[in-house]
Amino acid sequence: LFLCNSGAEANENALKLASFTTGRERVLAMHGAFHGRTSLAVAVTDNPAIQAPVNRTDKVTFTPLNDIEAMRTELRSGAYAAVIVEGIQGVSGIRVASDDFLRAVREECDATGTMMILDEVQSGYGRSGRFFSHQWAGVRPDIISMAKGIGNGFPVGAIMISPAIPARTGMLGTTFGGSHLACAAAIAVADVMKSENLVENARVMGEKIVAAIKDVSGVSDIRGRGLMIGVDLAVPQAEFRKVLMSHHHIMTGYSGKNTLRLLPPLMIGDREVERFAKAFRATA
C-alpha cells in the first residue's frame, strides 16, 4: 500500500510503478476515461480540452470501453506497460466496464506481461455495492488506485500493489501522504462503513432507486451499480436538474446534455430514496 493525497496522485504513481516494473513506456486507456488533471493522469484522460500542450504524448492509446478485440490487438504488440480502466466510468456518464471485458483484460495482461490498473477513485469504497467495483467481475488487478471515499472528504489517496511487484526503496514518494490526521480519518471511515454495513446498503438502496424511476416517462436508459447510477433523459439535463434543485432541494451530477449522475451518500435509507423518487417523478 502506498498512501498519497488524491486520485490524480494515486494514478500518477500507479502508472509510474507499472513502467518501472515492466520497463515499457506505453499505456492503454479507454475512450471516455477520466483519471485526473496532473501530468500522466491527464495524459490517459480522454479529454483534450484539459490537456495542456506539455501533457500531450504519443505514448497513450485509447480504445473503446468493453471492446475486447481492440484491447487484445493493442496488448499483443508487447509494447504496453499498463492498461488503466475505471470499473465504472464516472465523468463520461456512468459507463460500466463489463465483467467479460475486465476478465479479458486480466487474461491478456497475464499473457503479455502488462500491468492491469483499476482506477477505483470514484467507483471504489463501497459505492458500487462491492468494496471495489471490479470485484463484481472476480478479477485481481496488479494495482488499484483509490481516493475520494477513503477519507470521506479529507484528502487521502492510495494505491494497492500486488505482492508480485517488487518493492524498491525510493521508487515512489510523497510529501504529505499518510499523515497522522489523514490516517485517522481513513480509519474512522472504515470503522463506520463496517459497523453500519454501508457497502451492502449501497447495493440495496441502488436497486431501489433504479426500480423506482426506471419506468418513469422520459427515462431513455438507466445503468450503473449500487449508488453509482446514470440516467439518460429524453430532455436536456440542465433544466431537469434546475427543477430538482429549486423545487425539491436535490442536487445531482450530470454528463453531457442528457445524463444525470446519481451518487448519493452511502448511508441513505428508504426515506431518502422515496423522497428522491417522488421528486424525480414530479419533475419528469
Predicted feature residues:
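Conserved N-terminal phosphate-binding loop of PLP-dependent enzymes in the Aspartate aminotransferase
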Residues: 1-284
